[in-house]
Amino acid sequence: MITNSLLHQITYGREGKNWGFSMGLPKLEEIIDGVTQSTYTLVFSPTGTGKSSIALYSYIYKPLMEHLDDGNFKVTYFSLEMSAEMLYAKLLSMYIFEKYHIELSTKELLSRKKDYILSDENYEIVKQCLPWLHKVEEIVTVYDKSLSADSMYSLLMKELEKEGTFSETEGRKIYTPNNENLIHLVVIDHLSLARRTNGRTLKEEMDLISSYLVTLRNRCKISPLVIMQANRNSTAMDRRKEGLNNLRIDDTKDTGAPAQDSEIIISIFNPHREKLSSYRGYDIKSLGSNFRVVTVLKNRYGEADVEVGCAFYGKISYFAELPKPEDIYDYEKYNNPDWILDKKEDNVKMEDDVTNIRKPKFTL
């Protein structure tokens, strides 16, 4: 049975059906193969660094735009930090930027800025986006209430029963999906906000959530995306004194189970917050808080300890890969995301390779 299953996967791959979905970050895609079926990914960073934003941009928005109408993408998003409306507003902000070339933050869309009301013109744009949002709603299901391991498992089982059939074969529970091409992304944002139940500690609850996700990944080919906080403790201070500023796998907070269970671990690092003037040749004084280092710390299927320099525009939760530092001649242009819209006018040489700041980091 295993041999037949392996042959099926090889044949399936020869048809191009094992390819991952686009993430909007080509170099990162090349390293981790994009958003793929049956892959457990952990994303972590300190608070306010952009971990939820990269999840929304690279794991949801970009695949959505590629597979809005083909029925091959589904998202179950357990949002423990923001409401479903806020999450959709962030996706809308990205869409408006790409389609209308206008930067509208979620605060502006919701008229939450003091003395600010969304203009009639921009309100009309929002209404023009409603058909797109309705399509998104068919793909992205958001649960924004409290979550425990048991409630998560129950909700996911109900969703999976709609998408396929469970059966028993030779004492094994088998799941047969209605659509073999479907990538079902399951997002936990973020894990430390899980609700403790049945006398379990927070760590035990988090570990059980991760264990359930592994079970459903193996049986039903879901793709878990777990978001966690980083814990920069006293040992991290010692590392910074030695010039080792980026995150490590053991910087995850509250539990190490997701790091062990996952195939891919990605960290987001903000050198500006650490008061660095430069990082891997990038001028942080010029880029400021618009620069992020996206690091693949673990990759069960390929290369790890690889850094990718990215521009990040928090107003619209948007990421874009930067050229190599030696190819940047005008840092000022990266202070806003307009350069992304028309790369033909870029005054730097954009190279399509995956060697962007690929230097070994942990030389302890």
PLM feature spans:
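Core recognition of P-loop NTPase motor domains used across DNA-transaction enzymes
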Residues: 1-38, 133-136, 294, 359
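C-terminal regions of RecA-like/P-loop NTPase motor modules
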Residues: 2, 101-103, 130-133, 150, ...
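Cytosolic-facing regulatory segments adjacent to core modules
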Residues: 8, 12, 23, 30, ...
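Pre-Walker A (Motif I) flank of P-loop NTPase domains
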Residues: 36-41, 73
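The Walker A (P-loop) glycine that initiates the GxxxxGKT/S ATP-binding motif of P-loop NTPases
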Residues: 44-45
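Conserved glycine(s) of the Walker
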Residues: 50
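Hydrophobic positions on the alpha1 helix immediately C-terminal to the Walker A/P-loop
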Residues: 54-58
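Helical hairpin unit composed of two closely spaced alpha helices linked by a short loop
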Residues: 76, 172-214
